[in-house]
Structures are given as structure tokens and as C-alpha cells.
Amino acid sequence: MVPLRLVLLLHIIHFSCENEVGSAANNGSAQLYNYRKIHLPDDHIPYYLHSNRHVAALCLQDLHCPYKQHLQNLNSCWGYEKTCAEGHRFGYPVCDQVDFGWAKTIEESQQVFWRQADFGYVKERLAETQILCRPQEQGDSMLACSQNLQHCRATNLYLDLRHPRRGQENFKEDFLQEGEIGGHCDLDKQALLSQGAWKSPLQSWFAELQSYSSFKFKPIEDAHCDIIIEKPTYFMKLDAGVNMYHHFCDFVNLYITQHVNNSFSTDINIVMWTTSVYGYGDLFSDTWKAFTDYEITHLKAYDNKRVCFKDAVFALLPRMRYGLFYNTPLISHCHGSGLFRAFSQHVLHRLNITQHPATEAKIRVTILVRSTEFRKILNLDELVQALEAVPTFQVKVVDYKYRVLGFLEQLSITHNSDIFIGMHGAGLTHLLFLPDWAVVFELYNCEDARCYLDLARLRGIQYMTWEKGDKVFPQDKGHHPNLGEHPKFTNYAFDVEEFLRLVQQGATYVSRHSKWPLRRTRDEL
């Protein structure tokens, strides 16, 4: 009998081959593959070829292959592949000192960070995957999941939505009953039910899959489907679509899921799994174009039907325990996740967001202001005037209101900033798309010190925040409607001289960064 791991591996390879680059057209004069479907940043191509040797082999034979220069770098690897040597990984974190709560040496600290928040995280999800419903013959179904059902893969999946139990809840736990989800395979029910320790709407797929059943019929072959979905389908349970911090936990985990499945194809369906009758407000919907060529489907579109999915993925979730990046317990004093840098590059490439060529030797300072009631900068005009008096600064003030400024335009402004300044708030999630040499300056963290510091560490860019408590001036003590006094619920003024000192400190960092296109010495600034 073929080992279970090999069965799973062969299926994943099949998933990649069939859907990533299309079928070969080996007639001597035509391209052997449609390489345009790969659609990755040029720097990512060697890593893709390492994991897809069948594409590399065809590229070697193909006179029309645009990636021949990358065939010299096939040792390059993301880090989670079994054939990956440590020295050829996409990147490796930097640790400035030891966090003795996690490690005893710098080297051990780097390993901890890499496992927590880099491609080591992908490696651990792959290693813990087990088959819960085993196919016995060609055409059978399969269910394979990581621990606690945080991520699953299914083939020939049967989903009976003829009796939808929809209401106002987004994630109703008894939405599916026995016999309404499953496949034709040998189910280890005990193993499946043992994975419920982390049962929670945005932490696990246990509520949705606990009733997975083993059927005597083959759903597709035996004509038990009203609809058959041929394309690979990614099921996602989404966090708040009106908050960039929370929604980008969805997108980051979708990108990680692509790595787990070794497929970056956009020829996929994405189904929003919700048991609610309502729609989903999404202020960042342009981002989906980086992952799919099609509109997002609401699960209720399949109501009153039996639907069969040939290939289905239950994506990693936005608020998983020890997940990325909402609940990440991150070791201190380390920074620079290759995974987050790759995510940033991937999304920017797919959305066609580029660096504008410099027209003058200035550091681009962008100040993000808030049109909400709280956390406004009371003396904004004074601060801007002080910055504009510095000849080497090019200053832009923006308010990322979605009705005024589209998200792609927002990303372009962010990506073309060298110093990005803003009050504590979800808008600072834009730091994910700053260039590598940039500084994010959280003007005041409102006593929430870790949130954007840790996100900046993950992205690998320099983080700053206000340092002197006697030089920031709150309007009042804050007035949360339920919690009472709270620093996030007031507005602030800042000492102009201290503000300018900090921005100039950030400018020095930018000017000395090896990747800054207009690198200057401190004296020139």
C-alpha cells in the first residue's frame, strides 16, 4: 500500500501541475507552458522553480521560456521544502539580542522567530498534516488537515445545502448536520473528533467539519451533485472587512495557505464561508485580484443545492491560536520575516503597484490623518509646516477615506513613502507595503505598545514611536462609552521640536539604508 504521506504529496503535486501552469503543448515551436500564468515577482521565480521541478525541466528544453536565467539558481528555496538547505532560504531573521524567555543564544532566537513567523511556520503546518479520510481507489474523496483543523484539503467533497439554517450569526456551529458534508473515503472519525480543542469561529474549521461523513456513494461519479465545481475552491471565514488590520489577517493567511498547497494560481474560486443571510462589507476588495480572477462567492449562492467540489481548500484562519498575525506570540528583539516580505512583494506585483522613479533627491514623508472622532492630531498644521521647512523632505498629508481615495491609489502612495507617519490605528497596517528601507512612525501608540511594533518587525522595516511623555498633550483623559477613561478615545497635540527631531532620526535611517535608491550620507542630509 502506498504510504499516506506519499498519497497526500502526490495529490498536492497534481493540484499544482494541473492548475498552476496549464497543460503542455509540445509541438517544437510553441511554448511548452503558459508561463504568464505563474505571474510572480521576478525575484520569486527561482523559489517557485525549486518547488516545481517539472516546470524547470520544461523551461530548460523550451527555447521560449522567459525564466532561463533563473535555472542557475534552483537551489534557492523558501525554507519549508525538504530539499532546502538553510543557506539558500528566501531570508533569515535578524536578532539583536537574546530573549531569554524563549531562547539561550542569538542563533536559537533566530530559529524561534523563523518557526513562529517565517517560512518555518509553513514547514510546521505541512509536517503536522494528517489524512483523516483516506481514499481507497481512483476517484475517491480525501480529507487531510493540520492539527486542530486550522487548514484542510479535500477532494471530491460533497456539500448538501438543500436545508440551509441561516440566520444573523456569521458562524453558526450546527449549520451542517451528519450526512450534509463528506465524501467516499475511509474516515477515521475518532481522529477527526479529537481535533476540536481549539474550536472557535476564526480559529478552526472544526465546527464545519465535525459532521464530515463517509458515504457509500461516490458523490460525483454516482450523480449525487446538482452542481459540480471543477476549479479549485478556497473556503475562507473572514474577519472584519472594514478594518485593514483585521482583514489583512485574512489575506496573509490566504497567502500562507497558497504556500502550504504549492499553488499561486489565480484560476481559483474563493468562497466566503458564512452562515449569515447578510452580505459582507469589504473596503479592501481590490486586494482579491492578487489571488483570484473571479468575484468572491458567498456560500449562500449554493443554498438549496447539493454541491460537489473536485478540489477544496479550507484556508488558514485570521485569529488562530499561535497564528499570523493577530495572535502571534512573537519573540522579542528579532525582526525580518521573509514570509511577510514575500507577501508584500506578491501583492504589490499582482496589483501592479510600483516604485515611482525619483525626480529629486528628497525623502518622501507621508502623514496619514484620521477623519474619525478620536486620535486626531490637533496641531497638524504646525507639524507639517515644520517638516516643509526642511529642504530634503517632500511632505504629503493623506486621509485614506475609501470613498475619496481608492485602495490601489492608497497602496501606491504608501509604497512610494520613505517615512510613513500616523496615529495608532488600523491604517498603520499599510506598513506592510512600505519599501524595505522605509520607517513607520507610530506618532503615539495610545499605550498599545506591541501591535504595530510587532507588525513592523514581521515586515522587517524600522519602527519608531513617540518617546517623551512630557512632550505629548492629550486633549483630555479619553472617554470610551463603556470603559470610561481610555487613551485611544481622545485627540493629541505634539511638541514641534521633538516631532522634528524624531522625523530627522528616521530620515537618517532611510538615508543610510543600503536599498534606498538615493542613498546619501548623514552630512548631505
From Swiss-Prot:
It is found in: Endoplasmic reticulum lumen. Its main location: endoplasmic reticulum. InterPro entries: Glyco_transf_61_cat (IPR049625), Glycosyltransferase_61 (IPR007657). GO terms for molecular function: protein O-acetylglucosaminyltransferase activity. Residues 1-24 form the signal peptide. It catalyses: L-seryl-[protein] + UDP-N-acetyl-alpha-D-glucosamine = 3-O-(N-acetyl-beta-D-glucosaminyl)-L-seryl-[protein] + UDP + H(+); L-threonyl-[protein] + UDP-N-acetyl-alpha-D-glucosamine = 3-O-(N-acetyl-beta-D-glucosaminyl)-L-threonyl-[protein] + UDP + H(+). Keywords: Endoplasmic reticulum, Glycoprotein, Glycosyltransferase, Signal, Transferase. PANTHER family: EGF DOMAIN-SPECIFIC O-LINKED N-ACETYLGLUCOSAMINE TRANSFERASE (PTHR20961:SF148), GLYCOSYLTRANSFERASE (PTHR20961). Catalyzes the transfer of a single N-acetylglucosamine from UDP-GlcNAc to a serine or threonine residue in extracellular proteins resulting in their modification with a beta-linked N-acetylglucosamine (O-GlcNAc). Specifically glycosylates the Thr residue located between the fifth and sixth conserved cysteines of folded EGF-like domains. This is EGF domain-specific O-linked N-acetylglucosamine transferase. It comes from Xenopus laevis (African clawed frog). The gene is eogt.
